[in-house]
Each structure stands twice: as C-alpha cells, then as structure tokens.
Swiss-Prot record:
GO terms for biological process: translation. This is Large ribosomal subunit protein bL19. GO terms for cellular component: cytosolic large ribosomal subunit. Belongs to the bacterial ribosomal protein bL19 family. It comes from the Bacteria. Transmembrane segments: none annotated. InterPro entries: Ribosomal_bL19 (IPR001857), Ribosomal_bL19_CS (IPR018257), Ribosomal_bL19_sf (IPR038657), Translation_prot_SH3-like_sf (IPR008991). Disulfide bonds: none annotated. Keywords: Ribonucleoprotein, Ribosomal protein. Pfam families: Ribosomal_L19. The keyword Nucleotide-binding does not apply. SUPFAM superfamilies: Translation proteins SH3-like domain (SSF50104). This protein is located at the 30S-50S ribosomal subunit interface and may play a role in the structure and function of the aminoacyl-tRNA binding site.
C-alpha cells in the first residue's frame, strides 16, 4: 500500500461529518472536551469566528470573544476529537475572510450586522 493511499484512509476516518456550515462573522458556540486530572468535562466557548484557515483534515478556525473586558481568541482544529460540537448561534454579514480588524474595535463598533438564513 503506498503512502498516499494510507494517508487518505487515515484522514477519512478522522473527518467529522456533523460540522455545520459557518463562515467568518458568524457567532458560534464551541463545546470543547477538557481533561482535568481524571475527569473530563465539556467547556463552552462562544464568540465570533474571525478566520478559517487551511483545508481538509488540518482546517482550523479562530473564535474571538470579550471576557471581563479582555479580548480572548482561541484556535480550534475543525476535525479535532476534542471539539465535541459546534453550534451556530447567529449568522453575520461581513465582507472580509479574515476579521483581524475586530481586534482594534471596542464596544458597539465591534458589532457585526446579522443576517437571517
């Protein structure tokens, strides 16, 4: 068996089929499995998707939220087994693929217009 075929088989079994369609500007709620000692629990991280990067099994997305007045960004591998679930809370209308400019905006200026789907 050649390496390309082996690589394709391994990646196909790692792919998640239940990933919802979301784009930068959308507000998502990511359920992440967190291991603390011997326990495993689900932690929810909700924020705006500021970018999607890569493709295939190595695709990642970055979510930004404001927590106690401080901006927090977290990058997640899309097909990671640590990501239990992704919910789309709100669909936003933006005209860019990378929303890095949100890092410099504060308060109401950082809002994104919502669209109905």
């Amino acid at each position: 068996m050649n390496t390309q075929k082996l690589f394709r088989e391994i990646t196909e079994e790692q792919f998640k089929s239940d990933v919802p369609a979301f784009r930068p500007g959308d507000t998502v709620r990511v359920h992440v499995k967190v291991v603390e000692g011997t326990r495993e629990r689900i932690q929810i991280f909700e924020g705006v998707v500021i970018k999607r990067k890569g493709g295939g099994i190595s695709e990642t997305f970055t979510v930004r939220k404001i927590s106690y007045g401080v901006g927090v960004e977290r990058a997640f591998p899309l097909h990671s087994p640590r990501v239990a679930q992704i919910e789309v809370v709100r669909y936003g209308k933006v005209r860019r693929a990378k929303l890095y400019y949100l890092r410099n905006l504060r308060g109401k200026a950082a809002r994104i217009k919502e669209i109905r789907r």
